[in-house]
Design a protein with these regions (language model features):
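Short boundary/hinge segments that flank catalytic cores
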Residues: 99-100, 121, 130
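Conserved catalytic-core segment of NTP-binding enzymes
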Residues: 14-112
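C-terminal boundary of histidine-terminating zinc-finger modules
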Residues: 115-126
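Short, charged juxtamembrane terminal tails flanking transmembrane helices
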Residues: 77, 149-152
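Short, hydrophobic alpha-helical segments
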Residues: 136-150
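Single conserved hydrophobic/aromatic residue that forms the stacking wall/gate
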Residues: 1-11
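Short, thiol/selenol-centered motifs that function as redox-active sites or metal-ligating centers
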Residues: 10, 76, 140
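Short, amphipathic alpha-helical "lid/cap" segments that border enzyme active or binding sites
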Residues: 125-137
Length: 152
């Protein structure tokens, strides 16, 4: 017998009431959720709501990613915090979840997203490409651990 092939599907949903997430949880077996936020205080309200909902519905939370954590100046490599000091770390610590990545607001990434080209394919050695590759590898490991935990 051949090993069963695992398929991964990523569903991106905007913050809101949580109705979409609840519907998906009721209809699909969700292996894990990744909470993605920005450093803005208003976004953290949705993060907390999402964390509580996934905990209540027993959907494993793989971690938190902070998007647009800082602006990465292409000429100097200097980091600028566009949204001020982030409180994402405080929320992650309070609810006992790990921040898996702090992704920058990077001009090359934005340009390639607009063109529909993955930066990881175009410039795999770019700092941001490496961050996405590491995040993807980390998520796959966490998903495998969740699957192992659920089979025992």
């Amino acid at each position: 017998s051949s090993p069963r092939r695992q398929r991964q599907m990523c569903i991106r949903d905007s913050p809101g009431t949580g109705d979409v997430q609840l519907s998906l949880i009721q209809k699909l077996k969700i292996s894990g959720s990744l909470i993605v936020t920005t450093p803005q205080d208003i976004a953290l309200i949705d993060v907390i709501r999402g964390l509580k909902m996934f905990e209540k519905t027993k959907v494993p939370i793989l971690g938190i990613v902070e998007n647009m954590s800082y602006f990465l100046a292409p000429d100097t490599g200097k980091e600028y915090k566009l949204f001020g000091e982030s409180k994402t770390n405080e929320v992650a610590e309070k609810y006992d979840y790990e921040i898996l990545a702090n992704l920058p607001h990077d001009p090359l990434l934005l340009e390639q997203c607009e063109k529909g080209h993955p930066l990881t394919d175009l410039v795999p050695d770019h700092k941001v490409s490496q961050m996405f590759i590491e995040l993807a590898e980390n998520l796959l490991k966490r998903l495998k651990l969740e699957q192992l935990a659920n089979t025992n």
